Regions:
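Bacterial N-terminal signal peptides
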Residues: 7-18
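Blade/loop signatures of beta-propeller domains
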Residues: 23-71, 270, 274-283, 482-483, ...
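Beta-propeller fold recognition
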Residues: 29, 391, 395-438, 442, ...
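Repeat-blade elements of multi-bladed beta-propeller folds
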Residues: 43-47, 82-102, 126-151, 187-220, ...
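N-terminal cofactor/phosphate-binding cores enriched in small/glycine residues
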Residues: 52-171, 521
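Short coil/turn linkers that define WD40 beta-propeller blade boundaries
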Residues: 66-69, 111, 159, 251, ...
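Extracytoplasmic beta-rich repeat domains
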Residues: 75-86, 116-136, 164-198, 213-215, ...
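Beta-propeller blade signature
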Residues: 154-159, 231-233, 239-252, 336-352, ...
Length: 596
């Protein structure tokens, strides 16, 4: 089915005054969040439940009936821009964030507006665009982390603000040892620490992390961090990334875990990845610089892009971390740069590190661990391993024992790989996946019925070139990272069997890189959107495209499925992606089966 204009397919569209939906007063409490997998009609948290599997067991829409899938309603936000939200649904009400950090509550069966919170941005500039990846629901509140560095709790029935807290302000400990000039710089530039992820709620805590910490650039590798010199123009200092937990009732910070390890972020000066891939490092030079730059962890960057998964039995949350800062001048950050580019397990109640696995020590290429982590059980003979998997920008799916962090295996590569860990040169090298490739933030989906994981991939080659700049009379080398415009780029949707050491079961190629995420269902379907506006359903067993619909704008957000009454719905945001230059829009579309 292909329709160019959404106006032709709108069955219900409303900007009505607030009206309470049936059962809207039901509270999503701790027990419901713990048992979210059993609430098949709802989608209570990001990824649907704490395991982050992005799987719905609903099967009214299946391989036989999907050809009858049609739009049942369309809600247009009035705000165009990169639209990355994953809506939540509880008891017939949908909650969604939109670009610019407004939050809406909709009748999930009709798409009509129940209430809308209009966000007033406190900062005119941030280091990231207006996109937001979703809300969290619990204890009678809707929580949103914003692009102006705030965490907001709204009344779930009215959208009224309950509390509103700044989360991006540096602590006194972070500012310790800095000059007054640098303290002022960091404090006045907290707008460079927005938040994108949907918050995570458990017990009485709401957890969220900050982004853009790794955008800091080089300013002086020859002086200590206490230098009075502040980088000119846009040569921003990096800021120490973190994830933090807040009291759900007051917004008071309970603990904060930093993505850069204080005093020991140099690590072991690893010459290879953990799997043995050789890294281009001058260890003697790095060790020499490390003595001069021992406090560089204070501005070490490393963002947190996606909502952590949570294991209530182990009491651990799991998240991936971004690249260290400055990314373009590696000599300014000698050592492995712990815990950048890592999968990390954190005590959910104290914020203490349990284990970490650094995929790429001393990253030169922008290989953030940006995608969502997924929890699942991995058969091992007569036993079961509590496993965690995460797709990397390196192009592999990594599977670990989530209790110990031990790597069980990494999969077959789901995108092409070339010059993966090659050192940049004066002439320049072309590498892929590169900074834009592999698995970005887009959520993967895991089907617990067969153990297959479905990964949206990006093939977008990168050119890395050494450049030389003058700073304070010294010539400083830095890495210029560019899209390799002469190279073709595309996307891949890959099914990988986690029970067969990560073997690829099928793979399809798409015209454009895939950004947005996938949904697997009990109807043996996988749903995925594309930048060209197509929203499609595939047979989860063989990758055959069974259905598609042109949404009129890039579908670059993770879909969900839920049920209201006797009707199963598939819902997704269609608003495009400005970074990839996909067509913009402002719609959330709810699909269901037609009677014929």
């Amino acid at each position: 089915m292909r329709i160019k204009k959404l106006a032709l397919i709108i069955l219900t569209f409303s900007l009505s005054l607030p009206v309470l939906a049936e059962n809207s007063t039901s509270i999503v409490d701790e027990n419901r969040l713990l048992q979210a997998d059993k609430e098949t009609d709802n989608w209570l948290s990001f990824g649907r439940s704490y395991n982050n599997q992005n799987f719905s067991p609903l099967k009214q829409i299946n391989t036989s009936t999907v050809k009858r899938l049609v739009p049942k309603w369309v809600f247009q936000t009035g705000e165009k821009g990169s639209f990355q939200t994953q809506p939540l649904v509880a008891d017939g009400v949908m909650y969604a964030t939109i670009p610019g950090n407004d939050v809406v509550a909709l009748d999930a069966a009709k798409g009509t507006v129940l209430w809308r919170y209009k966000h007033k941005n406190r900062r005119e500039k941030t280091k990231a665009g207006p996109a937001n990846r979703g809300a969290a629901l619990g204890y009678g509140k809707v929580f949103e982390a914003t692009n102006d560095g705030r965490l907001i709790a709204l009344d779930k029935n009215t959208g009224e603000i309950i509390w509103d807290k700044i989360i991006a302000r540096p602590t006194d400990a972070e500012l310790q040892g800095l000059s007054e000039t640098q303290k002022k710089f960091l404090t006045e530039n907290i707008d460079s620490l927005p938040a994108k992820m949907a918050p995570l709620i458990y017990k009485d805590l709401v957890v969220v992390g900050v982004t853009s910490a790794g955008y800091g650039l080089f300013y002086n590798i020859f002086e200590g961090i206490t230098s009075e010199k502040v980088p000119p123009h846009d040569r921003f200092l990096g800021i120490r990334g973190y994830v933090a937990a807040f009291d759900v009732n007051t917004g008071k910070e309970v603990w904060r875990w930093y993505t850069t390890k204080s005093g020991a972020w140099e690590g072991k000066f690893s010459t290879t990845t953990p799997e043995g891939d050789k890294l281009p490092r001058d260890i003697p030079r790095e060790k020499e610089l490390a003595t001069k730059l021992k406090d560089r962890w204070r501005i070490g960057g490393s963002s947190t892009w996606m909502t952590p998964s949570f294991d209530p039995k182990l009491g651990l949350i799991f998240l991936g971390t971004g690249n260290a800062s400055p990314n373009d001048v590696s000599s300014a950050r000698p050592g492995d740069n712990l815990y950048a580019n890592s999968l990390v397990a954190i005590d959910a109640y104290t914020g203490e590190t349990r284990w970490h696995y650094q995929q790429v020590p001393h990253d030169l290429w922008g290989y953030d661990v940006a995608s969502n982590s997924v929890l699942f059980d991995l058969p091992d003979g007569d036993n079961v391993i509590p496993a965690i998997g995460i797709a990397g920008k390196t192009g592999w799916f990594y599977v670990h024992n989530r209790n110990t962090g031990e790597l069980i295996y990494r999969s077959e590569p789901f995108v092409p790989q070339h010059n993966l860990f090659q050192a940049p040169t004066d002439k320049g090298i072309i590498s892929f996946p590169g900074s834009w490739g592999g698995a970005s933030w887009s959520p993967v989906s895991y089907n617990p019925k067969n153990g297959w994981v479905y990964i949206p991939g990006i093939h977008k080659p990168t050119r890395y070139r050494l450049q030389y700049g003058q700073f304070e009379g010294k010539e400083v080398p830095y890495i210029l990272t560019e899209v390799a415009e002469s190279e073709p780029n595309w996307g891949t949707l890959t099914a990988i069997d986690t029970r067969k050491q990560g073997q690829i079961q099928w793979q399809i190629k798409t015209e454009q890189p895939l950004i947005g995420g996938v949904l697997a269902t009990g109807g043996n379907l996988v749903f995925m959107g594309e930048g060209n506006g197509m929203f499609a359903a595939f047979d989860s067993g063989n990758g055959k495209r069974l259905w598609e619909f042109n949404c009129g704008a890039g579908v670059n957000a993770p879909p969900i499925s839920y049920k209201v009454g006797e009707q199963q719905f598939i819902a997704v945001a269609a608003g495009g992606n400005s970074y990839f230059k996909y067509p913009s829009g402002d719609s959330i579309i709810g699909f269901g089966l037609s009677s014929k």
